[in-house]
Amino acid sequence: RRRRRRGKGKGGKKKKGKKRRRRGRKGKGKGKKKGKRKGKRGGKRRRRRRKGKK
């Protein structure tokens, strides 16, 4: 159970939320494109963690 709690990454969820808010505030074309790339990288990291849990 302890391993599952660490794997959920409470810190990771908070960081992703802050990044999304910052993208919206900057919001001038270039910032949005960079934000989309960062979002895809985060999605891949989540998938790898889920495979490890299984």
UniProtKB/Swiss-Prot annotation:
Q: List the record's Gene Ontology CC terms alphabetically.
A: nucleosome; nucleus
Tell whether Isomerase is among the UniProt keywords. no
An example molecular function term from Gene Ontology annotations: DNA binding
Q: What is its main location?
A: nucleus
The disulfides recorded in the entry are none
**UniProt keyword list:** Chromosome, Developmental protein, Differentiation, DNA condensation, DNA-binding, Nucleosome core, Nucleus, Spermatogenesis
Q: In which tissues is it expressed?
A: Gonads.
Q: Where, subcellularly, is it found?
A: Nucleus; Chromosome
| Disordered: annotated span | 1-54
Main role?
Answer: Protamines substitute for histones in the chromatin of sperm during the haploid phase of spermatogenesis. They compact sperm DNA into a highly condensed, stable and inactive complex.
Q: What is this protein called?
A: Sperm protamine P3
